[in-house]
């Protein structure tokens, strides 16, 4: 039995790990895990200092006893002549601790926080990698239903079972891939490197046709003035038809495919066949012009009768799923397709109707290999199919482009589903805006402006400022707390005053304010917008300095200030949110060169390692 030794006379907690049969009770201790909400960080298990990692065990020499804590129920404990030993299961719950037993079974590691406290490695760069977002994996979060084949950005089911576009999630997806792209360029790695890419389909002999008279496939090869070497395909549109196909490279690292095609009819489709390494399961991923009953990915159905349709079971070691491709490109026009099959297969396998939260499938490079790429219907394909390791530039472009195309007249990206807070004491109807979404969106767009050298991104970023000047009660994101302005992640009435969303909005405003040197000196309109961003940022920082102490509990931080208006208990921040507060506060402190903010962040780091504010 894992126990913790309580030395009241020394005010310290020591660990006692028992041996023998009691060791089998190890299953009672599980490491606390908490997936962070998609608007914040994904953090790894904390590393404690080397001096604190190992706590030597002493011989038990104790007898079983009965203990009562805070007038609660009695529990089994142990005592010897000097000390009393409490079960970790009790201490974990009572003191919000966590821990784990080492692999060798002789060492127990105790944590106050399950989240690692990070500080920025360098001064914040408005055009550089976005913090440690490069370690994110937005597309594998359990609330992400798919990366849409229509728009190439993630769709969420966090607050509604029907997939929808959540602006914060989309921006984080873009910032994740931008950060990876920048770090790859720093380390002289390029996703476009010829040595990493494999080009297929150039040779006409690589294009195979379906066998059997009932599956005839016509392939006509010619040179197109615009696209060069192409193949015109005419094949049966049924998904059961193999169509015209090309065998793909077997390397498990090359899980991203890219090609150009022009479909002529709505029944045109393409399919990637992948093989799982673990069980040799064959997975068919079809991309079709179908709405899918509101789903972005679904398992193919089998018609038993006119009134009875069921999902196709796993048959002969093979399953089939489809992604909705409607809206990606008009029929009869050329478009470029780029898909990461590692993501698409994982999202498909996680998409069953009876899926539970813990059924989320996450695949890693090496877990599958691509077998073939096939086409059906009437279409033309360029004879250049590219396989590569990553798609960072494309994913970043997709996110930035989505922001430009989906920005409304007020400069915002609205959330199309209801959001309820505090047991529905605060409710935001569909169509609400978020200051965090505005800030994240600006951070994506300013980087896209520099990376792609396209002013449409700069104009969109400038347009996003409008909602920062509109009150929450009027559909904007501007709130007020004791005379201090606040940019609301959730613009409820009364306000909720979420800390992390406010800090992210400040970073977005700062990003735009730093583009002055990149703007034409004769562009007075845009220069005025840059100045406006600076003023909004400065006003927010002034409020931060005034209100920040309200978020400090002396042992952790508070997520928001909803309790002030609602008269409820404070909403304490989980340790992963606490880690976000620390990181963002360090960013702002570095930008402002503010010693008070920096020391506050340092104090908050101490809370994660068991330090507490002094008593009176």
Curated annotation (Swiss-Prot):
Localization per record: Cell membrane; Secreted, Extracellular space, Extracellular matrix, Basement membrane
Reactions catalysed according to its record: [heparosan-N-sulfate](n) = [heparan-N-sulfate](n)
Residues of this chain annotated as glycosylated in UniProt: 188, 232, 267, 471
Extracellular side: 30-616
Positions of substrate binding: 136, 141-143, 169, 504, 562, 574-580
InterPro entries: C5-epim_C, C5-epimerase
Record keywords: Basement membrane, Cell membrane, Extracellular matrix, Glycoprotein, Isomerase, Membrane, Secreted, Signal-anchor, Transmembrane, Transmembrane helix
Pfam families: C5-epim_C, Glce_b_sandwich
UniProt keyword annotation of Transmembrane helix present: yes
Site (Critical for catalysis): 136, 143, 559, 577
GO molecular function, one term: heparosan-N-sulfate-glucuronate 5-epimerase activity
Tissues with expression: Expression in comma stage embryos is strong in the hypodermis and intestine and weaker in the head region. In late embryos, larval, and adult stages, expressed primarily in hypodermis and intestine.
Parts of the chain on the Cytoplasmic side: 1-12
The protein's assembly and partners: Homodimer.
Family to which this protein belongs: Belongs to the D-glucuronyl C5-epimerase family.
Protein purpose: Converts D-glucuronic acid residues adjacent to N-sulfate sugar residues to L-iduronic acids. Plays a role in the early migration of AQR and PQR neurons, which descend from the Q neuroblasts.
Protein name per UniProt: D-glucuronyl C5-epimerase
Lineage: Eukaryota, Metazoa, Ecdysozoa, Nematoda, Chromadorea
